[in-house]
Amino acid sequence: FTKVIELDPNWAEAWNKRATVLYLLGEFQKSQNDIDKVLELEERHFGALAGQGLVNIQLKNYDKAIMSYEKAQKIYPTMKSPKIMIKEIKELIKQQSI
């Protein structure tokens, strides 16, 4: 995807796909950097917002993860995963505070 980004750096989906690959490789901060670019190009990219939530969970930035999922849910209210993930993150926070 790097080559595609070089050819068209304004194509948000290329950045999003590379962010996904980086996430799967465990390169969470690099993935976050690409997600930031996606959202700079297309602030309503709900897939990138959901991905940002996953990255923030891995980085243990739980409040940021919840905010990402809330934004995704606001943009795409019928998408079920943000609601589920928000609930799971809140439960995780609760368990860690015990």
Q: Where do the protein language model's features map onto the residues?
A:
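Register position in tetratricopeptide repeats
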Residues: L24, Q58, E88-Q95
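Canonical positions in the second alpha-helix
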Residues: V4, K37-V38, K71-A72
